[in-house]
Amino acid sequence: MRLQLLSDLHLESEPFDPVPAPGAELLVLAGDIDSSWAGFERFRGWPVPVLCVAGNHEFDRRELHQAWPALAQHCARCGIRLLERESLVLRDARGRSVRFVATIRWADFDLFGTTQRAKAMRAASYFQRVMRATQDGAPFDAAAVRGEALACRAWLHHALTQPGEPADATVVITHFAPSLRSGDPRFGSQSTTASFCNADDDLLPLADLWLHGHVHSRHDYHVAHARGRTRVVCNSRGLESRGEARSFDPVLTVEI
């Protein structure tokens, strides 16, 4: 199956016209498409099915529990399937079955280990300062983000380790990155990187392909393990005004 991958388009702040990639059988949107949600209309009538995981900015200035069903309904009206802690099996043109396992996978701030967690959470003022989201009326701060992240992690681990519908390949889709290897090279191992990447390296062997967004840099690497190799790909556009979109490929396709 040939997948087109886009993320971090930030259509609420910069113009960008997405186009279908030649030969793609499916479009994957890995979050932060448009904080206003208006940009999802760009994908109405897309020539192939569209799967999406939400990004953190899809919740800017919103109440988390109210936003989830509203976003799912909005995406559905645009012909987009929003997935959150859901698995879905699709078949490609050759009849091969591909299982998609998807969640936003918020940051749990354990990227650098439990001893550095408090420092990483203090550095995560970003979530309150920029998002200004709420959860049950309270600020969606670092502690609340971690709570959601742990629930995502538990679900993801269960989905990848328990028998499910048989499939020829498994693709994980998250917004937050699964490894420090996907960290933005501009920031390296700063504490703030734990707001963008998780230490999900132990889950990588359970997938054939892992697609993510969130970091405004591109990544395409393989991780070798006893089961073989897992490919990790991020095709984040980022903000052109900051020079982040220079190597972004608007028609990138990934074969699985």
Model-identified regions with their sequence ranges:
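Active-site-proximal loop/helix segment associated with metal-binding centers of metalloenzymes
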Residues: V101-V171, F176-F187
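Binuclear metal-dependent phosphoesterase catalytic core
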Residues: Q73, R77-C78, R94, D184, ...
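N-terminal active-site segment of His-dependent metallophosphoesterases
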Residues: M1-C52, F59-A67, R132
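Beta-strand-turn-beta hairpins that frame and shape the catalytic cleft
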Residues: M1-Q4, L88-A102, M121, A169, ...
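A basic- and aromatic-enriched beta-loop-alpha substructure that forms the phosphate/nucleotide-
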Residues: L51-E58, E63-A123
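Active-site environment of divalent metal-dependent phosphoester hydrolases
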Residues: H10-P15, D34-G39, H57-A67, V89-A93, ...
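Short amphipathic alpha-helices and their capping/turn segments at secondary-structure boundaries
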Residues: R44, L82, L88-S97, A154-P166
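Active-site neighborhood of phospho(di)ester-bond hydrolases with catalytic His/Asp-centered motifs
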Residues: L5-S7, L27-D32, L51-N56, R81-E86, ...
